[in-house]
From Swiss-Prot:
Keyword Aminoacyl-tRNA synthetase applies: no
Classification lineage: Eukaryota, Metazoa, Chordata, Craniata, Vertebrata
Gene Ontology MF terms in the entry: cytokine activity; receptor signaling protein tyrosine kinase activator activity; receptor tyrosine kinase binding
Native species: Danio rerio (Zebrafish)
Annotated localization: Secreted; Cell membrane
Name of the protein: ALK and LTK ligand 1
Tissues in which the protein is found: Expressed at low level in the notochord and iridophore stripes, the eye and the swim bladder.
Phenotype of gene-disrupted mutants: Fishes show reduced iridophores in eyes and operculum, with no detectable phenotype in the trunk. Fishes lacking both alkal1 and alkal2b show a complete loss of eye iridophores. Fishes lacking alkal1, alkal2a and alkal2b are embryonic lethal and display total loss of iridophores.
Recorded family membership: Belongs to the ALKAL family.
Entry's Gene Ontology BP terms: iridophore differentiation; positive regulation of ERK1 and ERK2 cascade; positive regulation of ERK5 cascade
Length: 152
């Protein structure tokens, strides 16, 4: 039963490849659109491992992944419609402004909680990326109301 399914799948793929190449031979198709289904499939397969993105720090940088000996190492050019990476300088006090807005004022910590505050404020993802500033404000208010910080 499995062999029959494999033959059906194989025959349908071959049929699709043949019909797509014959369809593209018509006179109505422009030269720029003249790609067979096989070329499109190879392009998609070739782009997936090569277009992995690695995020380091604040900016994302595209880097080619290391390929094993079994993977295809074909490097295809990127399409022209890919957007360039924009580097926007950030205001250093922007984080403080957002957190003051979300916490409805400045958050004050006693000396016992300063180390916890600095760990959260400077070393977590929530307080280092602008998209997570609301989470950071929530974490800091929970820390300010925790029993450890309210004991003094």
């Amino acid at each position: 039963m499995r062999a029959e399914k494999r033959w059906h799948i194989l025959l349908s793929m071959i049929l699709l490849l043949i019909t797509s190449s014959q369809c593209m031979d018509s006179k109505e198709v422009k030269e720029s659109e003249r790609k067979t289904l096989l070329n499109l499939i190879l392009q998609v397969i070739g782009e997936k491992p090569a277009s992995r993105r690695v995020t380091s720090g604040l900016y994302s940088v595209s880097q080619d992944a290391k390929f094993s000996s079994r993977e295809n190492t074909a490097h295809l050019p990127k399409p022209d419609n890919s957007r360039p990476i924009e580097i926007v300088p950030r205001d250093t006090s922007m984080k403080d402004k957002f957190i003051e807005h979300f916490t409805a004022g400045p958050v004050k910590f006693p000396s016992e909680c300063r180390t916890h505050f600095h760990r959260i404020y400077h070393n977590t993802r929530d307080c280092s990326r602008p998209t997570y500033y609301k989470r950071c404000a929530r974490l800091l208010t929970r820390l300010a109301m925790s029993p450890l910080c309210t004991q003094s």
